[in-house]
Amino acid sequence: ERMVNLTLEMIYLLTGEHYIPRKKSDDGGALHAPGSVIQKENNKNDKKILELMSNIIQLLTGEVAIRTGHVSIYFSLDEWDYIKGNKDLYEEGIKEEPQQPLPPDCEYEDKSDITADLGGTLYNYNEPSKIRAEGGDFCANGNPTNPEISPMKQPPPANGIKEEVASCDGGRQSDCSINPLTEQIQGTDIPTPIMGYNHLIIQAIKDNENTSPHESRFDRHHTTHTTEKQFSHHINLHNDLSIHAGKKPFPCSECGKCFAGSSELNVHRRTHTRVKPFSCSQCGKCFSNQTKLKYHHRTHTGEKPFSCSECGKCFSTPHVRARHQKTHTGEKPFPCSECGKCFARSSDVTVHRRTHTGEKPYSCSQCGKCFTRSSDLNVHRRTHTGEKPYSCSHCGKCFTTSSELNVHRRTHTGEKPYSCSECGKSFPTSSEFTSHWKTHMEEKPFSCVQCGKCFSKDTHLKYHYRTHTGEKPFSCFECGKCFTHNGSLKVHLKIHKREADFCSKGNLTNPEISPVEHYPPTNEIKEEATSWEEGNQSDYSINSLTEQIQGPYTPTPIMEYNHLIMQDNKYDVNACHSPLQETDVTKHALHKRDIDRRQRTQTQLKYDHRTNTGDKPLSCSECGKCFSTYHVLARHQKTHTGEKPFSCSECEKCYARSSDLNVHRRTHTGEKPYSCSECGKCFTRSSDFNVHRRTHTGEKPYSCSECGRCFPTSSVLTSHWRTHTGEKPFSCTECGKCFSRETYLKYHHRTHTGEKPFSCSECGKCFTCNSSLKVHFQLH
């Protein structure tokens, strides 16, 4: 509507016909032209027409122009509002502008004036009280009547733009030097002062405040524009002219790479100096530019302002959103030249090519382990440093990866994204949902070969097998009691935890409460001991103490026994080393047992704490793998030392664990206790039998969190996972080549030894692996 009004007003000034816009009437008329023609005042009309044209251009482009000499500078409306609101910033920039000497050979015949066009109103800067150039006054004696601008004699130099105009006092010259514009500070939203243009901007603001919007300045608008260019946001005129000329005058002294602007060069230099001046106030992490710091802050605040238009998923940075959107379009423009596999990003195909070349350019300085991705190396380094940079804002618990933190956060938020369509019950993880789904399907694919009992999980079947074999692999560190599964052990450990809580309250030195009454013995105790009162002999009997039952229990008081253990703090740790009478043996033994138990309990509490926090402070000196307890570390180190203390009496083959020896003995006896009810095939191990059953059921319970692919065994999933991480832990001792699976390393070893154990029964040809033999069989 405003555009129409301005256009009609301009038509009126040009033609004298006064058109009036009207609403559409019943007879269909849209415009009424009364035909009245006014007497035009040429001078005033020209001024008004120019003002109307400027307003129309401003509405069309959304920009405000400042013109000076040969150059026009365009600001957006938001930028111009900001400049008017922060004129103090530009006034300060004027004071800091250096004085430029006047070249002696510059002569101009005509005078010049400088104008600024602000939103349709043109401003002239030729009064000495309003504008001053670096070399002298502009037009000290008044306005010129017919100014002309001399064209530039040479291209602008690389270090700035210099425009020379004639003074108005007849022969005295002054120059107007436009200094290099100060560089935009990367990542900031505060414009820096515009060197050389500040006086124009400030004067335009003052004129805009003091001048009526209807006052015309057409008489003062006679500037000829030889160079016009729009400079958006924070202006850098010098860089723009360099880009326009195709110049890159800022070379890097390290690598020789050139840049069009010095700000780009400064950012590039940080790749050589590794300077990271922008640090996070939350975690102290440093970054090379402020944009990266801004994105990093969102990991603390959880802000994700960029949402996907397809699925509504939100992201913290626009480039991550762009990468996500390719999952909807299915675009994968980067193919692998070796196998033809396509990827959405060029970086992914670069990493993928390393699976063909075997290249692992990222090595750990601590243990020498190599990786194909830098991100995998960064995660691996945390096993050495113990760094856990992802902390929960609710409880403060820390994690090594962001995915672990995301799963943990659901315990606070209660988020359960996996819901059952049958009953509506929700679960925080996909694995829990899969287990629940089997309860609706009544699927119990795991059956016991001994008794036929069926289970929904292979772990439940594994625990059930132990009721037949009597195996109890989980032992208590305190008392040595063994259990079939870890859950029963945890319940049992609560007994010792109560003991630790009791000891931590200082009751060992309290004469009124004895810690022994919280340790139920396994049989009846009857002892004679000397009373602490007047040396009389007394009998003390402890009855009704039953054998310790697994799980929580209620401590049974030991009647009148407290004073035998402690009286007035006479028994302490040092008392255990004092000479004892025969009648004091019981008191000493019970008290020493209490001291030993407290020490063992403290150790167990330390291990329990590591289990809860995930802390693994004990690392293997050979490979760097970490463990939470010493005995697990010791068991692992046997794989490096080759220690195998359990030997077979038949063939003298040795094993590191007794369970492995028991399975090996079946190779001599021929025992295969686990048989398949579908095909009748038998197995020596229950684990092998469980894997075999999945070939009938088609079950693949182990899914990859990266690509969703499922596998029948955890070992196959582990091998598959290495295709994502690029890990190849099995290296050849001969040539150093690394492999992701041990079987691949085994086949590779045969290329060095020349072993070919698989022979063809038809022609006798031998092969290093069975798959090659199968391919050969097809020829026959």
From Swiss-Prot:
Gene3D superfamilies (alphabetical): Classic Zinc Finger
- ZnF C2H2-type residues are 250-272, 278-300, 306-328, 334-356, 362-384, 390-412, 418-440, 446-468, 474-496, 618-640, 646-668, 674-696, 702-724, 730-752, 758-780
Fetch the InterPro entries from UniProt.
Znf_C2H2_sf, Znf_C2H2_type
The alphabetized list of GO BP terms reads:
regulation of transcription by RNA polymerase II
Protein name (Swiss-Prot/TrEMBL)? Oocyte zinc finger protein XlCOF8.4
Which species does the entry assign this protein to? Xenopus laevis
What's in the keyword line of the UniProt record? DNA-binding, Metal-binding, Nucleus, Repeat, Transcription, Transcription regulation, Zinc, Zinc-finger
**What the protein does?**
May be involved in transcriptional regulation.
Which SMART domains does the protein's record reference? ZnF_C2H2 (SM00355)
Q: Where are the disulfide bridges?
A: none
Gene Ontology cellular component list: chromatin; PcG protein complex; transcription regulator complex
Pfam families assigned: zf-C2H2 (PF00096)
Q: Where in the cell is the protein located?
A: Nucleus
